[in-house]
């Protein structure tokens, strides 16, 4: 897929930031218009993250115009907004391949470009990494500058404030740009406030401010009076007191879509000493009316027709696992006003929109705060409520200690609804749910379930909800179910699997949603297949029976083989002194790259043909 660059004459002049910095400042608004149109035309034909990038066009241009990237370090938090950055840093011709197998990475990625100083994908890491880079640059002594761009959503995470507290304490030379797209442009964001921002970021003000501090350092009462007066005057037009208390010099808010004003302010701030924070106001989806009106729906998009202004409706008739969870949540809450649903800023992705509307008093979006989400659930359980923490597998990694320390040790009945377990697809290494079974299986007191279809998912959610002896987890994949008929939720017997097919010589022990592939491979081999259902506790009796009746055992899971469900089977067989050859099939010791789920499963030999090939190769040794 290629674009006629002649339709973007100014953009054509800037294949990289060195050329961008040769442009006259007056041409930057035109460049921004063309860059925004280029982004619209490319993402509409390829799919990808959309609204965030539209809102960050002017900021991206201004940063590369003022800072000497890649000599200066530019760090993007999460990376959803970094498509314009990729277009301006030598990857313009490949932007249509983003999120595809072998294409551009969906997020800034160090292996892809020298302009990507930090590989990202998860939230709120930029300031911590940027602080480390700033300290390293200071010791290097070459004048390298560090800039971190973080959104208002990512700023809600504790890690961001931990980093700012540290930066303010050691007075590191760095700039944090707070890209605030939650609110519309306020009255404070206009010519007057832009002018004030340039004054407050100027060298004269900075020198007077620091000189005054030194002069008054021996007069604490006067120094405190001056400090309070300054805060009062700035507070009349800027909401920066919190950041000032953390040790940052706060500038803003300024209009994030006025590229020339941004350039002027950034030039003033580039050489300021100590930690600086520039607060800009932007509009998510800027320049494309449907995305401005509904930035949540247009956050990440499939291919679409820009002229229609609508997103294509899903052609599938099967419900997603996220919807299955959301519907179960509503059904259960209807009969239990003590059920509490918790999400760390993933309402839409986790299927909780309906629940949040129908049961607002039982719904808690705690923002990007996974650690808090888990311990908040622990507190609710102590108070006699029935918490359900809905969280993506890759994000649960961020709350591991809380699962152990605050929930499992205390045997609190918290249900974890773990979405996006296994291969997730196009978002690449940072978002694959590859490790949850491994890092959860070793935690005492925790029941772990892996449904093989959408109806089994409902039954397992009910099982975890009714289980009161400790925490439980139901781990399900991204995507749609198999079409299994839905029956009323009913608790399953804990730690019991089901034999799905009886064969000879070989038994496949399946954990989770690869059951259809296991059954297909088993048909060709005349193998037995067990739907194990529970990773913990294992069905010891079923494993013993299969081991005694078959020559070979195969475990199958969409999780890291190391420490996963198959490892649990191996450990049990050793404990039972049942020496049987076991092949553990799953995700090997490498990070899973981007691609469609089908492509990745085929490449990793987790489709039926691949499972058969792995098994036949193993038997032939």
Curated annotation (Swiss-Prot):
Binding annotation for Mg(2+):
152, 181
A GO biological process held by the record: isopentenyl diphosphate biosynthetic process, methylerythritol 4-phosphate pathway
> Which SMART domains does the entry link to?
Transket_pyr
Reactions it catalyzes: D-glyceraldehyde 3-phosphate + pyruvate + H(+) = 1-deoxy-D-xylulose 5-phosphate + CO2
What EC number is given for this enzyme?
Answer: 2.2.1.7
The top EC class, named as a word, is transferase
- InterPro entries, per the entry: Dxylulose-5-P_synthase, THDP-binding, Transketo_C/PFOR_II, Transketolase-like_Pyr-bd, Transketolase_BS, Transketolase_C, Transketolase_CS
User: Gene3D superfamilies attached here?
Assistant: 3.40.50.920, 3.40.50.970
Specify whether Magnesium is a keyword of the entry. yes
GO (cellular component) term, any one: cytosol
Q: Which family does it belong to?
A: Belongs to the transketolase family. DXPS subfamily.
What assembly does the database describe for this protein? Answer: Homodimer.
Name of this chain's protein: 1-deoxy-D-xylulose-5-phosphate synthase
Tell me which species this is from. Answer: Edwardsiella ictaluri (strain 93-146)
Q: Which gene encodes it?
A: dxs
């Amino acid at each position: 897929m290629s674009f006629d660059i002649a339709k973007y004459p100014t953009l054509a002049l800037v294949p990289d930031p060195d050329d961008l910095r040769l442009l006259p400042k007056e041409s930057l608004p035109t460049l921004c218009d063309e860059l925004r149109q280029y982004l619209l035309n490319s993402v509409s034909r390829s799919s990808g993250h959309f609204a965030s990038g539209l809102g960050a066009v002017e900021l991206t241009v201004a940063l590369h115009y003022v800072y000497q990237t890649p000599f200066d370090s530019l760090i993007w938090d999460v990376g959803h907004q970094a498509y314009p950055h990729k277009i301006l840093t030598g990857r313009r011709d490949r932007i249509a391949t983003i999120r595809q197998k072998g294409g551009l990475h969906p997020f800034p990625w160090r292996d892809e470009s020298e302009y990507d100083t930090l590989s990202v994908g998860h939230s709120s890491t930029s300031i911590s990494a940027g602080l480390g880079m700033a300290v390293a640059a200071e010791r290097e002594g070459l004048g390298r500058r560090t800039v971190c761009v973080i959104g208002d959503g990512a700023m809600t995470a504790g890690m961001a404030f931990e980093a700012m507290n540290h930066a303010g304490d050691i007075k590191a030379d760095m700039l944090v740009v707070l890209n605030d797209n939650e609110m519309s442009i306020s009255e404070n964001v206009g010519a007057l406030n832009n002018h004030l921002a340039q004054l407050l970021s100027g060298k004269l003000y900075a020198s007077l401010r620091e000189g005054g501090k030194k002069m008054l350092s021996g007069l604490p009462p006067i120094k405190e009076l001056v400090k309070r007066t300054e805060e009062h005057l700035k507070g009349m037009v800027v909401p920066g007191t919190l950041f000032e208390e953390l040790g940052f010099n706060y500038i803003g808010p300024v209009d994030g879509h006025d590229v020339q004003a941004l350039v002027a302010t950034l030039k003033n701030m580039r050489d300021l000493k100590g930690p600086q924070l520039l607060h800009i106001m932007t509009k998510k989806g800027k320049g494309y009316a449907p995305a401005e009106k509904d930035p949540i729906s247009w956050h990440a998009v499939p291919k679409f027709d820009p002229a229609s202004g609508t997103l294509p409706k899903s052609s599938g008739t099967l419900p997603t696992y996220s919807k299955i969870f959301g519907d179960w949540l509503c059904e259960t809450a209807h009969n239990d006003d003590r059920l509490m649903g918790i999400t760390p800023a993933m309402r839409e992705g986790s299927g909780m929109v309906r629940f949040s509307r129908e049961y607002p008093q039982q719904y808690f979006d705690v923002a990007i705060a996974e650690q808090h989400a888990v311990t908040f659930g622990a507190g609710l359980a102590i108070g006699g409520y029935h918490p359900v923490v809905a969280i993506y597998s890759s994000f649960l990694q961020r709350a591991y200690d809380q699962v152990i320390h605050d929930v499992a040790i205390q045997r609190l009945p918290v249900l974890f609804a773990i979405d996006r377990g296994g291969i997730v697809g196009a978002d690449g290494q940072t978002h694959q749910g590859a490790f949850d079974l491994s890092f959860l299986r070793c935690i005492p007191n925790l029941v772990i379930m892996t449904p093989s279809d959408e109806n089994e998912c409902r039954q397992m959610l009910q099982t975890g909800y009714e289980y009161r002896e400790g925490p439980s987890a139901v781990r399900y994949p991204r995507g749609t179910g198999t079409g299994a008929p839905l029956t009323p939720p009913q608790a399953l017997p804990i730690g019991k699997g089901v034999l799905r097919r009886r064969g000879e010589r070989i038994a496949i022990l399946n954990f989770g949603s690869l059951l259809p592939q296991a059954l297909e491979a088993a048909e060709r081999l005349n193998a037995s297949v067990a739907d194990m259902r529970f990773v913990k506790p294992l069905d010891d009796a079923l494993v013993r029976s299969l081991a005694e009746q078959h020559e070979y055992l195969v475990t199958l899971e969409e999780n890291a083989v190391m420490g996963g469900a198959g490892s649990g089977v191996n450990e049990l067989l050793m404990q039972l002194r049942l020496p049987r050859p076991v092949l553990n099939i799953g995700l090997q010791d490498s990070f899973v790259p981007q691609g469609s789920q089908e492509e990745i499963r085929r490449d990793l030999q987790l489709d039926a043909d691949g499972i058969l090939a792995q098994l036949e190769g193993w038997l032939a040794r």
